[in-house]
């Protein structure tokens, strides 16, 4: 299940960008 890990990482980055807001 490596694909799930990659998708999770991308979601985490997207969340950080939104939080960030920047």
UniProtKB/Swiss-Prot annotation:
Source domain of life: Eukaryota
Stretches the record annotates as Disordered: 1-22
Biased composition (Basic and acidic residues): 1-11
Maturation and modification: The N-terminus is blocked.
Residues passing through the membrane, by range: none
Compositionally skewed regions (Polar residues) per UniProt: 13-22
Note: On the 2D-gel the determined pI of this unknown protein is: 7.5, its MW is: 38.5 kDa.
Name recorded for this polypeptide: Unknown endosperm protein L
Organism: Hordeum vulgare
């Amino acid at each position: 299940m490596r694909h799930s890990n990659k998708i999770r990482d991308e979601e985490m980055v997207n969340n950080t960008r939104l939080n960030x807001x920047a």
